[in-house]
Amino acid sequence: MKRIYHLFLVLLILCCTQILFAQNNVDMLFTSVSEGLAGHPSELVYLQTNKGIYETGEDLWFKAYGLDAQSFGLSDRSKTLYLQMMDAKDSVVWREKYPIENGIADGHVYMDEKLVEGNFSLEAYTRHSFFNDTTEMLAARNIKVVKNIAHDSGQAEKRKKRELRFDLFPEGGNLVAGLPSRLAFKATDGNGYPVDVEGTLYIDENPATTFKSSHDGMGLLSFTPSVGRNYRIELKDGKSYSLPEIYSQGMSFQLLKHNKEWMEFVISQTEGVPEQDVYLLGQMRGVVCCVAKGKLKNNLRIKIPAMEFPYQGIAEFTLFDGTMQPIAERLVYVHPEKRLNISIKLDKDNYVLREKATLKIKVTDDGGKPIQANLGISVFDKIYVNPADPANILTHCYLTSQIRGIIHNPAYYFNEENKDRMEAMDLLLLTQGWRRYVWRFGRSPYHGGIFLTDEISGTQTVKSKKKSKETQSTEQLIQVSGAEGKSAFVWADSTGCFKVGTNMMKEIRGGYVYLKPMLSKEFKPKLEIIDYFPLIDSIRKNKPSCYPIMDLSQVLKQQVLDMPVVSNDSTILLDEVVVTRKARKPFRDKFMGRLDSLAQANLGSAYVCGCGYLQNYKPGYDAHPYWKPCSISADKRSKPIEGEKYYIVKFKHLGGNAFSVEDEQLVTYHGETYSEEE
């Protein structure tokens, strides 16, 4: 009986030990991911401009969104936006700081008349989005500057011809002998632009299978590799490429099926390898969403419910063996259906020049429920669209900021009209690879290097040697004043360091901020403000830009496809068309907007008096007779708003102070209109 009891006790201890060991492994995964997340920027900044092409002498208006790096909701961590614009030679042409309120900053950049035509980059940095060890420049917006839009050809710059680059990517990371494998490939022209290719896989110089790219130079081929055989790929142009190393034993990790409800993976290992525990961890943007554990002998299938991931985006699955070593990795795009649906309805179909337009905007979630959203809208001539800039908030948040390298035409993967977009997305994830997480088992957690501040920081020094001892180990007062006369005070500590907080800057905003030491002149005080822009430049110049690209030849090809169809006998086949007049090239001039404003500012034009009546709008109609003017002072007059309704009145003088009202009308105000030539 004792032996049975002892045996039962030993088995119980072993069982508990295994359970605890497995639980410790899972806890280790959670801890490692959490510690790794703490060292990375907690914010992501997205920049939106009011258009893509600008003429010199005008303003660029922008809106910057500070987003939580995990949920992509608005973040309130950073309070100051550092913004600068770089030219094609990477020289700074503009830099400024803007306040961030509730995660949003907006403002404008003046495009100087002396700017040279070309491509420029607008870059944004915040305290919690840009660290001193940031690997790539993420928060940017490429724009184009021209002297006059009428002289812009719209054609792309000629790219230098470079040797074809052909890369191979085994699914899961490695090719293992005897295990079915999928090999993704990607072909580019060396500038990052895709090249369609086709070729043949040779085994021991015998053709085994043919293949060709299916989207943007990317494709996939399947085979089972063996040790001791010679493998190579030959493209149609005759160039030959070797395959990655084939391992004699190991594991393979493949995505078998994927739909809205779940993802099914298959894990395989070489025959004869002992059975072992494996762990599959799923995370999204640094947050662990699920961990699965199983026993692997030869093959193991694991199903992961898609509902484990709360957001749309890239899910990273990492496979660990029984010793908690990462073996393979696979990226999967989940919940593409989780998106906002925005509908815009105009109050009418056609408008005359300078007529007021009313929009009704409705925003719903993927379930059709109305939700509150922070939106931006800009209206401009479509000639100012930059076809070379394919970036938008979806591509920036879900792709560009999440995977390595430069992505060509990322908007393709979010356009529901592209029926193969999810298959193309899977190819992209197989070839681009993961960007940012490094497993750190057994090492101290790393915390990223924050160096920017939201405040104005500086130091006060005393130049007088005689008086310097009097200020040692004491705090000194500094006055902070705004342009409108508002002032406040801050203290410099015993070392002379001081900060002007964001709340104080908000109270005195409206122009320049002036700082004045309160020490008398005999101390010879001097204030030095820390300028973080030079430090930003020293960091960003060593970082590659991963801004997405667009092949303009594809854009031009699409424009050609939109043109009328030409038959074999050179006649143009048209749908039913009603010709009303001879078409004319639109007249555009960079100064017209400015002239329109000047015309509307004409001092002799209509105005709204202090009582709210419209004056000088229609001959014979005045809100007040000339012998009895408005009792409210003239400085209360205001400019009428286009499209608003106002009352106008027509009076008849009966003699003395007597008068009668002959007519009263409620009219819609429309400003004076001018022809383009005027």
Q: How would you name each of these model-derived features?
A:
Residues 1-29:
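Bacterial Sec-dependent N-terminal signal peptides
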Residues 24-43, 53-55, 59-98, 131-133:
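Contiguous segments within soluble domain cores/interaction surfaces
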Residues 40-44, 85-95, 202-206, 215, ...:
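Short beta-strand and strand-turn-strand segments in soluble, beta-rich domains
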Residues 92-95, 138, 208-210, 287-291, ...:
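Local beta-strand/beta-hairpin segments that build beta-sheet-rich folds
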Residues 120-124, 231, 315-317:
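A short tyrosine-centered beta-strand micro-motif
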